[in-house]
Amino acid sequence: MTYRAAQNLIKRGDEPALRAALDTGLDPNLVNQNGWTLLMLAAVEGNLPIARLLLEKGANPALCNNKEETALTLATHRGFAQFAEILA
């Protein structure tokens, strides 16, 4: 599965399809050309269930994008303070 396809699942909030992709080999730390991880996408969408799923499957919350932002930084800047509980 490509980053773009995974991104679409996250934007749609399609947790079952994302889980199936992760179960069949999708890397939970997949990044795009800007260094954005799937966890970062979930964070900016404010989607806690998908963020929890990605963490459960091995997503690394400490990874930074090309601007040195983490998923926690991105979520906090968008007002999703509840992400601090699962990402810190």
What positions do the PLM features span?
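Conserved ankyrin/ankyrin-like repeat signature
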Residues: 17, 49-50, 82-83
